[in-house]
Swiss-Prot record:
Span(s) of short sequence motif 'HIGH' region: 131-141
Name under which the protein is recorded: Arginine--tRNA ligase
Domain of life: Bacteria
Record keywords, A-Z: Aminoacyl-tRNA synthetase, ATP-binding, Cytoplasm, Ligase, Nucleotide-binding, Protein biosynthesis
A Pfam cross-reference name: Arg_tRNA_synt_N
GO cellular component terms, semicolon-separated: cytoplasm
Length: 534
């Protein structure tokens, strides 16, 4: 665990040992449940804070300040310069310069820094986007594409085995409507009222090939351009026509999970927590859309994935209990499913809501947005909020080339570091790339804040993988950028004093590495030169 440099976990273990000693003559059990390590609310209180004394006060019937002082006496001091107690009973801990040096030098020299932070490694299949091949991907699909790929990268970095998949809804009535719409254009007729009316239908009609295949290929190319790389595109049509669907229904029947009523076949989903049983085969003998969905999820499990993540739009909220029941049934409760319901995206130009796309006749397409503002701003903005919150996306802000634009702000931090090293070379100033950091030689408020900020990286990865949230890593990149810009304004990095210059350059070299790792994970470019360089 030490090599992973998860400081919250390391500090938690230190507190645990101190608590064992302090509580050895009491009846208190499950010591770890009382320990929570957080960041101090203000730098003047230290780096980390623990409220364990207040949690124990009720159990021990003692004053929390008295408990905190007693625990503090038993804490191993080797990682800390200062351990203090603050009202009403917080234990505040400040990292030592020696330990900061040790961690940052490890960060610089270790390619696996912050990797493999999870102990319970899983084989995970993440299914996302899964759009109908009937039209361009809209901006909502773009949000799921950004979240799905960034989350997959986080899970991989944390140590899980991850497979990314797009389920192609290439069967059913919508495909018939697509074919009829394209044929109508080709024959110079009016598109049926319930058909697809976007301008893109004319483009599809001009091409040779099957309409759904043409559209799917364009979706694949756009996702690749967007930095979303699927491992597989699974076909609903193959599930329906390849015999797999019938085999799954036979499996459920043998398990006693199907019954007939009103000439239809029903799945006993209430047995697994759904509010009502669901039809899988209609009275006319055709399967409902739910039947291939059950089959597809069984297919995932049969391939060895027992932890499934589905990223869906919020309009699928009623679907969650039934598909969760299906996964429990087909896996015999050996697999688990997490459904992430992403909320909608509202596009603005300043204060004006952008409502329609002329090209698609529907929601604004992802390609329209990328063409206008670029991949990096699109990805970053779509990742800025929790998936459970709706997102207001200002296209004008995303195009700005100043610090009001958050993606510019964070990329400029990376470019600023690169520019400093370019200037170092231009000025032919000395720097020893192999010399370890000694933070004590440059210890001021901004350098210490920056150093301690980048040391949070392993914890940020671990917590993002645990919560399945990406926006926390976006916030973290912004905090690093803010600390870097503050450091830059407070300190002359290319200082004439070679000793000070050495330490400041080593510190920002470490910052560059962490920002680069964050950018790779969230899927934005590591830009080395920008238009506003000093």
């Amino acid at each position: 665990m030490e090599s992973r440099r998860m400081l919250k976990k390391i500090i938690s273990n230190i507190l645990k040992e101190a608590l064992k000693e302090y509580l050895k003559d009491t009846d208190v059990k499950d010591i770890e449940s009382y320990i929570e390590i957080g960041y101090a609310v203000d730098d003047k209180f230290g780096d980390y804070a623990c409220p364990v004394a207040m949690r124990l006060a009720k159990v021990l019937k003692k004053n929390p300040l008295e408990i905190a002082n007693s625990i503090t006496e038993k804490i191993d001091k080797k990682y800390f310069d200062k351990i203090e107690v603050a009202k009403p009973g917080f234990i505040n801990l400040t990292l030592s310069y020696n330990y900061i040096n040790e961690c940052i030098n490890d960060l610089i020299n270790n390619d696996d820094y912050g990797k493999n932070t999870v102990e319970d490694k899983k084989k995970i299949l993440v299914e996302y986007v899964s759009a109908n091949p009937t039209g361009p991907l809209h901006i909502g699909h773009g949000r799921w594409a950004a979240i799905g790929s960034a989350l997959s990268n986080i899970l991989k970095y944390a140590g899980h085995e991850v497979y990314q998949e797009f389920y192609v809804n290439d069967a059913g009535e919508q495909i018939t409507k697509l074919n009829e719409s394209v044929k109508a254009v080709q024959e110079g007729r009016e598109i049926p009222e319930d058909g697809y009316h976007g301008e893109y239908i004319k483009d599809v009609a001009k091409q040779d090939g099957v309409p759904k295949d043409i559209i799917l290929e364009s979706q694949k190319k756009l996702l690749e351009r967007f930095g979303t790389h699927m491992d597989n595109y699974a076909s609903e049509l193959k599930i329906r026509e390849g015999g797999e669907l019938e085999k799954t229904m036979d499996f459920l029947d043998k398990e006693g999970l199907l019954f007939e009523e009103d000439n239809a076949v029903w799945f006993k989903s209430t047995k697994y927590g759904d509010d009502k049983d669901r039809v899988v085969k209609k009275s006319n003998g055709t399967y409902t859309y739910f039947a291939p969905d059950i089959t597809y999820h069984k297919n995932k499990i049969d391939r060895g994935y027992h932890y499934l993540i589905d990223i869906l739009g919020a309009d699928h909220h009623g679907y969650v209990p039934r598909i969760t029941a299906a996964v429990r049934a087909v896996s015999k409760d050996t697999a688990s499913l997490k459904v992430i319901l992403g909320q909608l995206v509202r596009l603005y130009r300043g204060n004006e809501l952008v409502r329609m796309s002329k090209r698609t006749g529907d929601m604004i397409s992802l390609e329209d947005v990328i063409d206008e503002i670029g991949v990096d701003p699109t990805r970053y903005f779509l990742l800025m909020r929790s998936y459970s919150s709706s997102l207001d996306f200002d296209l004008e802000l995303a195009k700005k080339k100043d610090n009001d634009n958050p993606v510019y702000y964070v990329q400029y931090a990376y470019a600023r570091i690169c520019n400093i090293f370019f200037k170092l070379e231009e000025k032919n100033m000395s720097y020893d790339d192999n010399k370890p950091l000694d933070i004590s030689k440059i210890a001021n408020e901004s350098s210490l804040k920056l150093a301690k900020m980048i040391l949070r990286f392993p914890d940020e990865i671990y917590e993002a993988a645990k919560s399945l949230e990406v926006y926390t890593l976006i916030n973290y990149t912004y905090e690093i950028a803010s600390a870097l810009h503050r450091f830059y304004y407070d300190n002359i990095v290319l200082e004439e004093n070679a000793e000070i210059r050495q330490e400041r350059l080593t510190l920002i070299k470490a910052v560059k590495k962490i920002l680069g790792l964050c950018f790779d994970i969230i899927g934005i470019s590591k830009v080395e030169r920008m238009w506003s360089e000093e």
